[in-house]
Amino acid sequence: MATGNVIQVIGAVVDVEFPQDAVPKVYNALEVENGAAKLVLEVEQQLGGGVVRCIAMGSSDGLRRGLKVTDLERAIEVPVGKATLGRIMNVLGEPVDMKGDIGEEERWSIHRPAPSYEELASSQDLLETGIKVIDLMCPFAKGGKVGLFGGAGVGKTVNMMELIRNIAIEHSGYSVFAGVGERTREGNDFYHEMTDSNVIDKVSLVYGQMNEPPGNRLRVALTGLTMAEKFRDEGRDVLLFIDNIYRYTLAGTEVSALLGRMPSAVGYQPTLAEEMGVLQERITSTKTGSITSVQAVYVPADDLTDPSPATTFAHLDATVVLSRQIASLGIYPAVDPLDSTSRQLDPLVVGQEHYDVARGVQSILQRYQELKDIIAILGMDELSEDDKLVVSRARKIQRFLSQPFFVAEVFTGSPGKYVALKDTIRGFKGIMDGEYDHLPEQAFYMVGSIDEAVEKGKKL
């Protein structure tokens, strides 16, 4: 193995000089010996003259010029397979949960080609989530990609935790969770939530949190994806959760600036679309198995046209948009039913009844949105009888779109509810047809199925 020496350290970027005839390849892993501590670097650029520029996969504190560096002659490799289930690992696949070695039988490189055209397969099967607003308005496809878009504090992580809990309990497959640049507290909460729900032995956890160097946050999504690919290639249906894809982009921006590339729009890296494509093209289903991915996407300043969320949109099958206006009404999950979309919402896929109910709900809510200005200026009394009925039903639908979550029981004090798709369709169809016009609005707030709303209405 070739050895070189550190010649420059600038934060997370380290320049290493090797002999001219043994320059490491781009993406090779290098190991720096700094006393007892070992730091892994990843080669990003070859500068000529035997010098390579690398990104540190850990803190570069204590590094100095002249330290010996060994070329491992391979990319970063991480453990894959069943040994990773129930464990928490970092970007290098090292355990961070104090439970000893992973004991894996196989390690895979985190840089892998996307499946070829012949290997790809698409599915029309729906994945029931038990969350009314998602199942009705933006149904998920098995083996599809879903984005949860939202600004700060509107509930992306809570929605994702509820999805993981529901799917892990109702659908007995394996899941991989990649925490990319999120809060360590959330990672901790998530681990305990999974343990309490008895689904931890079906989930592999990979964390690269907010306080870690940009190299970790840029590569940790690939580490999680590699573990998911292994399960898929064994012929399984895997779930891959990434929280948060925006931090992946942001880490790329930091690395790009440190490597001296010229920034593009809004200061993002010039390779934004390519970096996103490299990750997203690997998250796909093949003829062997499927990867269904749910990705949380932070929307900077609630602006969906920002280059980062805009680049992510192109890769998704379904988008769940969380809205601050809906959250401010106290309706959780704060999903915007008029802004969320899904390719699966097609009568040929979901069936005519589901399609008609979803579109009917949207048209009632859209009409209510248009009438809001008139109500604000002139009041309800100025509306026609038909419009009054539309407003009354729209307000019931809006409240019925709320739902108590299992993972939020500690905050809401009410037990979580899982609602089957057929019950969801029956409930909204009934409200639209006027079967529940006699019930007060409050009866529909924070309940599961329509039967619970009727029961609640009797008590009010």
Curated annotation (Swiss-Prot):
F-type ATPases have 2 components, CF(1) - the catalytic core - and CF(0) - the membrane proton channel. CF(1) has five subunits: alpha(3), beta(3), gamma(1), delta(1), epsilon(1). CF(0) has three main subunits: a(1), b(2) and c(9-12). The alpha and beta chains form an alternating ring which encloses part of the gamma chain. CF(1) is attached to CF(0) by a central stalk formed by the gamma and epsilon chains, while a peripheral stalk is formed by the delta and b chains. ATP binds at residues 150-157. Its main location: membrane. The keyword Cell inner membrane applies. InterPro entries: AAA+_ATPase (IPR003593), ATP-synt_VA_C (IPR055190), ATP_synth_F1_bsu (IPR005722), ATPase_a/bsu_AS (IPR020003), ATPase_alpha/beta_chains (IPR050053), ATPase_F1/V1/A1_a/bsu_N (IPR004100), ATPase_F1/V1/A1_a/bsu_N_sf (IPR036121), ATPase_F1/V1/A1_a/bsu_nucl-bd (IPR000194). It comes from Sodalis glossinidius (strain morsitans). Belongs to the ATPase alpha/beta chains family. Produces ATP from ADP in the presence of a proton gradient across the membrane. The catalytic sites are hosted primarily by the beta subunits. It is a peripheral membrane protein. The keyword Cell cycle does not apply. It is found in: Cell inner membrane. Its EC number is 7.1.2.2. It is an enzyme of class 7 (translocase). GO terms for molecular function: ATP binding; ATP hydrolysis activity; proton-transporting ATP synthase activity, rotational mechanism. Pfam families: ATP-synt_ab, ATP-synt_ab_N, ATP-synt_VA_C. This is ATP synthase subunit beta. It comes from the Bacteria. GO terms for cellular component: plasma membrane; proton-transporting ATP synthase complex. Keywords: ATP synthesis, ATP-binding, Cell inner membrane, Cell membrane, CF(1), Hydrogen ion transport, Ion transport, Membrane, Nucleotide-binding, Translocase, Transport. It catalyses: ATP + H2O + 4 H(+)(in) = ADP + phosphate + 5 H(+)(out).
